[in-house]
Every structure is written in C-alpha cells, then in structure tokens.
C-alpha cells in the first residue's frame, strides 16, 4: 500500500505541476471551497470540483486529524492561501477516477495507521479520498475528471480573467478606493468573483471569522508554517498568492477594521467609520463576504490545526490587537496595514486612500511589497484623520501587540503585561504620553521640547491643569525671556520655572538677567504683590498658583543672594538696598523729620538725601571719614567697601527698627556714598544723628551688647582682670586725661552731649560698657563720655581733621562727627600713643566715666574705637602688665605700624598673657587679643588672627576696617591702654606708661560686638 500510495501521490504531484491548476484552478476551487462552506455544495461553473472542494473543506478536519503539523501546514496553505493543495488530490482523482476508490481505501488505511503523517501530500491524499467519495455520491466518477479537465481550462481562463481583473483592481486599489472595495470583495481565493459571491454571505461570514478569531488567541511568529510548503505549493502561492493577497488584504483589512473598531475602544472608532464610509459595500457586505470566505477557510484551517492539537497553529496568523486570525500572511499583513494594528503610523503620500482606514506600516517581518503598496495607498487619506487617536491607539497596541509576542519563555509577560510598566516609565511628564521605547520618547522630547518642562511635580500638576491657558500666557508674559517666545509654548513654562522671576513670573534667558531684574525690581522679595499680581492676572489662575509657590521659593532665597542683589541694586540706587525694607514696610511710611512729609520706606533714603544732603556738610564728613576712618577702618570700610554688606545688614536691622531706620536713614542718607553705610552702622549701633532711633537701636542692641559684653567681660575679665584693675587704678588718670583733652578742644564737647541723650547713655553703656567693662559709672557717664569724647576726639579731629569737630558741634552731625573723631582718635590718638579710647574702655567705673567723657562721643565711635582697640585691649590686658610694653605697642599702633608687627605683637601678647595666666587663669589657653576667643595652641591662635583679624591688614585702614582686631594689633598699645590704665594716662597726656594698664573688660564685650559686626560685614561683603 505504501508503494502504491507513494506512486499515486507522485503521479498526482506531476499532474498538478503539469496541469498548472495552481493559481487559476486553485483560486476557483478555493472560491468554490469557500462558497461550498458558506453557500452550498453546488458551483455554477464546476459542481464536481465544487463538491470536491466543499468536501475537502468539510472533510478535511476528519481526514486531517492524523496529519502531522507539517502536513497541516501544507494543507492549510492550500486551503487558506487558496493554494491548490486540496485540488491536486481532486485533480488526481479526476484524472484517475477508476483508482479513486482504491486510493480512498489506501488513504483511509494510511490515515488510520498514521502512515501518511510525514507525507507532505497526505492532505492531498485525504482530499482525494473525500473527492472520490463525493464524486461517487454524485454518481459520476469520471464526470469530475472530465468536468475537471474540461473546466480546468474554463476555470483557468475564468480564473485568469478574474486574476487579471484582480490585478487591475489591485492597481486601482492603489489608485482609487472604489477599486479597493472591489478588491476587498474579490478574493477569498484571491479571485474577485469569489469575493462577490461572498458579499451576500458577508454577515454570517463576519460572525464566523470573529468566532474563529476568538478561537485564535495567541499569535505565533507568522510564516512558521510557510517553509514546509512544497515547491509546487510555493509556485502556486507565488502565482496566485501574490495577486490574491493584495486583493484579499483589503477585504480582510476591512473586516479586521470593523473588528478593531469594536475592540479598540475609542481609538479605532474613527478608523472604523472611515473604513465603513469609504467602503460601504465592503464594510457591510464585502468584508463579510471575505470573512465568510476566510470563515470557510478558517473553519478548515481551524479544524485542521485544532484537531491536530498544535497549540502553535492557533497563533500563526493572528492579529494581536483584535485577536482576529488569518489564513495567510498576506491577509494578516493587509489587516494590520489597514487597521494600523501594527502599532506604527506612516504618512504614506499616495494620492489614493483606497481604504479610509488609518494606515500603519505593517511590521517588517509581516510586510510584503504588495502589502506595503496597499498600506501606503490606504494610509494617505486616513493618516490625517487617525492622528487624533494615534496616541491612544498606540498605547493600546503597545499593551496588546508586542512584536514578537513570544520569543522566549516569559517574554510575553514582559512584552504584554509589562507593557503598562514600560508605558509608565517611558512617559512624557509634560503631556502624559507613553512610549514603547526610549528612542520614541527621546524623539518626542526633541520634537516637542517637553523635556524643558520637567521641573517639579507641583508645577507639572499646575501646568497640566491649565496647560492650554498657560502656554499662551507664558509666551506672552515673559517679554524679556529668551526661551518663552520659542515655538514650543512648553519652553516658556520650563524657562519660567528655572529662570523666572518668582514675583512676576517673567522668564529670562540667563541667571544674570534674572538677577539684574530681581535687583532692579526688588522682586527677590516676598511681598512685592503689586508687581507680581498684574503678571499673575495676565497669566491666569495656574500661573498665580505658581506665583504663590514662586513667592515661597523667593522667600527661601539665600541671604547671600539677597545681599548680592541688594549690592547690585545699591550701585545703581538705594532702592535696591532698601528692597528688604520696602518689602518689610511696603505699606508703611516714614515721616521725614526735616520736612514732616510721610515717605515710603523704599524711597526714604533718597528723600533724606534730598532733604538733608544740602543742609548737612557731607563732603567734610566724608573727607573726615576718609582721614578719620583710615585710623578707624571699621567706619571707612563700612562707608566705602562694605556698602552692600552694610546695606544688607542695615536693611535687616532697619526692618526690625523701621521707625528708627527712617530716622537713621535721614541722617545716614545725607552722607551720600559713605553716609548710608555710616548711617547703617550708626543705626546698628544705636547711634543716630537724631537721638530718637539711636536709643532704640542701642536699646535693642544694647541688650545684646550688654550680654556679649558681660560674657566677654567674664572671659576677658580673667584675661584682663589684672589689666582692668590696673585700668581702674589708671581710671582717674584717664578721667583726668580726658578732661585734659577736652580742654584742648573745649568747643566740640558741648555739642556732643546734646546730641547724645539719655538714650546714648544706654547705647553708650552698651558700647562703653563693652569697652569699659559695662560698669554702671560708665553707662551713666556715657553722656559725659560723648562730651568728653567730643573733647577728646576734638583734639584728634583737630589734628586729624577739623571738619569732624565742626560737624560734631551740630547735634545732628554730632554723632557722626563723634564717630569720625573717634576714628581720628583711634588713628590719631593711637598713632600719638593716646590711650584715651583705652580709658573709655577701662572696665573701672572711674575709667568708664572718664572714657565716657572721652572722644567716644558716639557709641559707634566708641564701638569702632573698640573695634580698632578691642583686640589690643585684650593684648593690652596682657600688655597691661608692662606699661612700657603697652606704651611701645601703643607707639607701634599709633605709628600705624605694619600689620605684620601688629600681628606679631598680638601673638606675643596673647602668649604672654596666657603664660601669665591672663587667659581665664589657664596658661595653656591663649585668648585672642581682639575677640577673646580661646585657643589651645599658638598655631591655632595665629591662624585665627590671620584669617579673622588680619585679613584686610594689607591696608592700614583694612585692619581697622576688618575689625578693631586689625587696628588693635597696630593700636595694640592703644587697646592695651584701653584695657590698661596706660591708655587713660595716654588720654590725659597720651602717656604710654598708663597704657600698660589695660581694661580687658572693655575689650572683651566690645571686641565681641565688634567682631560680630566685622564678621557680619565680611560675610555680607563676601556674599555681596
């Protein structure tokens, strides 16, 4: 049997190859098969063939159960691809009718014995058996052969004609949608006639393929069954399949499109509508007919593969999107192209959108030249319409159709179920669009520049809520922003988020521009609601929300940045310097003491300049400041170098002392360049040309100074307790010395006392107490100190610069003049070896009272003097032990000796005092002569001096400016006189011997405060 069977099969094969039943006949039979499956057993052209085909369609499941997957692959190809695999057996039976019964028996036995499992023609044999049975039933065993042979040419001619028509239609499909409709109708067998026949049966056919598609759930790599096809089947496919695929593809695509429309939720609805509208007959009848044909084929295919139990058979040609199964790769390709189920959209510019369905390029592995052409033709019209739903459709496709779906075990989970995770990860934070790959998201970001908008979650939320409203406003609002006008409106939000003024939401191209804007508009402040509100109104609610957040952020701007902004602003005008004040008291107004008018805080300084600038001799004071401040660099520095720092500190202080600030501004403002700084210093120190704010400032700071002075006094007391005691002994000398000086300049002293009120007493005690140890007498004698200081300073000012004295005489200028005179004293007295300031700083009450009378006309002057001599006092305490050494050191400072000398002196004094137990009685601890900071080693102390007190020692004023510490090294003798009585004698006659008596109490409190001031200045200057 096996031999006979093999011979018969070989004969059949030869007959098939020779007769070329392949394309035309196969198509006709396929059409007959589909017709037989859908319509009935009768065929108008070839009933016998039809009966055979129908029998094959229906019996193939029974006959094929024994077939192996290979055979199955062959037979399905014949059935599904309209290949003549089924027909070759039928043709053979027709050619060999007498042997059909024997063949049937052989085939039955072979199938039962599974002998034909490996035979690629087993399907043909089974089909031959069924065909012979059907032929016998019809009663004409030979008639099928005769009819078949006769009708083969007819059907062949018909098929050729049909194929020609189909080819024409395919060309027309590429050019016209009508032809596409016909093409859709055309092929189950890839023949138009069969498609037309199937149109009537289309509705049930649609249902059938759907059920079949439901059966086919998981897609397998397409073309897996194609390789087993025999050469003759390949030829058949090449001949008929190429033509029929494209024809069949549109119909299948239409059907799949309808299914996709149902299953793609909202994304494919427009696509389905277009497909149905473009092909009404196709959508309603043709796709149905095609589906019926495919349904017949699917039935044979499905039964064949499912009966074989091949799990992979279900997934051979299955749309992963709509789960619809297809008999051929061409059908699936066409379906995916037309329905865009491949997940790719291509804007094919073909003139004819054959099918109004959104077209997407089929996967490369599924794409064929014909399918590509069809896809391009159909995509032209539908690409624009489908753009709206492309993103959502793509998302669904990404979820449902990872290609390939099953490459390795578990990969389907990653590609399918894990798609959601991937979409969440590869998601545009701006528009929320998800992407299947990083490359897609990258291209999206590049095209839309949405990456510029990824700033913060809160901003993302606000932008999402008001995206549409916000974009136009963003572009419009940031007129100066370079990025805002960029084509993608999204750039403006990103720029505004990064380089945007938090007050007015104006975007800037660079940080420098933003800083300039903030400094000029004072938008670095939190409160400028007026400036912020108009832009906010323009931008809309979302922007207002962002504005609020921006205000919060601007609140958190670093002090350094604020100081920088203030400094930059102060260079142009004081408005920027007053920005914090304006913020603090935007609604408050300060009454000008000169004109009595109420002026806004931000504008008060300028007003003061105008009102007081003329009346107050600014140049003399400035010149004095130049001369006097050099001796007392703290003032000079405050006036010149640290304007931004001082302004920043001023503003901070002024905010807390608004009213005082205004007054301070009044007097401080008149010194145009240096005065604001000096005024700010006076304000901080509580020294005001107008005593009103001097007292409050001093009161506020007085407590702090007193505390620091007491603490430092305690610290320095140990260091300079002996020196202070010596000072106390020298205090009378100082007091006397002070009177001696006061006679030298009797005129100036009277004005300072009026200038200095009881408030100055309080303030002065702070300063004086710090300097003098905060003794009660000192506090009480602050007024006298001012007088005495005026007298004492007047000699200095006379020697240094008479202008300061003249200025001091006026009550308003008295404080400033006193300060200048103090600076003069610091420089002049120290240079001349005067220890008057030291007397003022003496901790002893008598010294305090005398020092109060001394040239410390103002707390600020005393403070600056202390700053200059604060460190020396501690050294003075140390040097107080030896008046001669103090005197020598005093001589060095008075001579404005090199910083190096002062530095060496400070180091030596600290070491000596430590060795003498002056530093808290512990010889192992070295205390800074300037700030009383304890150090365990000389190296640490030297480092401290170099980093803190001698940073600006390069200039004579710089040490002083740096801090009393700086000058104190120079005026260490002076400082020591302060702390030591030597200074008080020096005050009287500028006697170096008394200078040895140092009042460490004076230095330590004063030095603390001064150091604090210096550090603040340095910090602000660095920041600024």
Curated annotation (Swiss-Prot):
<feature type="compositionally biased region" description="Polar residues">
    <location>
        <begin position="20"/>
        <end position="35"/>
    </location>
</feature>
<dbReference type="InterPro" id="IPR036236">
    <property type="entry name" value="Znf_C2H2_sf"/>
</dbReference>
<dbReference type="Pfam" id="PF00096">
    <property type="entry name" value="zf-C2H2"/>
</dbReference>
<feature type="zinc finger region" description="C2H2-type 4">
    <location>
        <begin position="926"/>
        <end position="949"/>
    </location>
</feature>
<feature type="compositionally biased region" description="Low complexity">
    <location>
        <begin position="368"/>
        <end position="391"/>
    </location>
</feature>
<dbReference type="GO" id="GO:0008270">
    <property type="term" value="F:zinc ion binding"/>
</dbReference>
<keyword id="KW-0539">Nucleus</keyword>
<feature type="compositionally biased region" description="Basic and acidic residues">
    <location>
        <begin position="786"/>
        <end position="795"/>
    </location>
</feature>
<feature type="region of interest" description="Disordered">
    <location>
        <begin position="868"/>
        <end position="891"/>
    </location>
</feature>
<keyword id="KW-0805">Transcription regulation</keyword>
<feature type="zinc finger region" description="C2H2-type 1">
    <location>
        <begin position="317"/>
        <end position="341"/>
    </location>
</feature>
<feature type="region of interest" description="Disordered">
    <location>
        <begin position="786"/>
        <end position="818"/>
    </location>
</feature>
<dbReference type="Pfam" id="PF12756">
    <property type="entry name" value="zf-C2H2_2"/>
</dbReference>
<protein>
    <recommendedName>
        <fullName>Protein tiptop</fullName>
    </recommendedName>
</protein>
<feature type="compositionally biased region" description="Polar residues">
    <location>
        <begin position="796"/>
        <end position="808"/>
    </location>
</feature>
<feature type="compositionally biased region" description="Low complexity">
    <location>
        <begin position="718"/>
        <end position="729"/>
    </location>
</feature>
<feature type="region of interest" description="Disordered">
    <location>
        <begin position="712"/>
        <end position="759"/>
    </location>
</feature>
<dbReference type="GO" id="GO:0003677">
    <property type="term" value="F:DNA binding"/>
</dbReference>
<dbReference type="GO" id="GO:0048749">
    <property type="term" value="P:compound eye development"/>
</dbReference>
<dbReference type="GO" id="GO:0048730">
    <property type="term" value="P:epidermis morphogenesis"/>
</dbReference>
<dbReference type="GO" id="GO:0005634">
    <property type="term" value="C:nucleus"/>
</dbReference>
<feature type="compositionally biased region" description="Acidic residues">
    <location>
        <begin position="159"/>
        <end position="175"/>
    </location>
</feature>
<keyword id="KW-0217">Developmental protein</keyword>
<keyword id="KW-0010">Activator</keyword>
<keyword id="KW-0677">Repeat</keyword>
<dbReference type="GO" id="GO:0006357">
    <property type="term" value="P:regulation of transcription by RNA polymerase II"/>
</dbReference>
<dbReference type="GO" id="GO:0000122">
    <property type="term" value="P:negative regulation of transcription by RNA polymerase II"/>
</dbReference>
<comment type="function">
    <text>Tiptop (tio) and teashirt (tsh) have, on the whole, common activities. Tio and tsh repress each other's expression and tsh has a crucial role for trunk patterning that is in part masked by ectopic expression of tiptop. Both genes share a common activity required for the activation of Ser and svb and the maintenance of en and wg.</text>
</comment>
<keyword id="KW-0863">Zinc-finger</keyword>
<keyword id="KW-0804">Transcription</keyword>
<feature type="compositionally biased region" description="Low complexity">
    <location>
        <begin position="527"/>
        <end position="537"/>
    </location>
</feature>
<keyword id="KW-0862">Zinc</keyword>
<dbReference type="InterPro" id="IPR013087">
    <property type="entry name" value="Znf_C2H2_type"/>
</dbReference>
<comment type="similarity">
    <text>Belongs to the teashirt C2H2-type zinc-finger protein family.</text>
</comment>
<dbReference type="Pfam" id="PF13912">
    <property type="entry name" value="zf-C2H2_6"/>
</dbReference>
<keyword id="KW-0238">DNA-binding</keyword>
<feature type="zinc finger region" description="C2H2-type 3">
    <location>
        <begin position="499"/>
        <end position="523"/>
    </location>
</feature>
<feature type="compositionally biased region" description="Low complexity">
    <location>
        <begin position="477"/>
        <end position="489"/>
    </location>
</feature>
<keyword id="KW-0479">Metal-binding</keyword>
<feature type="region of interest" description="Disordered">
    <location>
        <begin position="350"/>
        <end position="392"/>
    </location>
</feature>
<feature type="compositionally biased region" description="Basic residues">
    <location>
        <begin position="543"/>
        <end position="558"/>
    </location>
</feature>
<feature type="compositionally biased region" description="Low complexity">
    <location>
        <begin position="874"/>
        <end position="891"/>
    </location>
</feature>
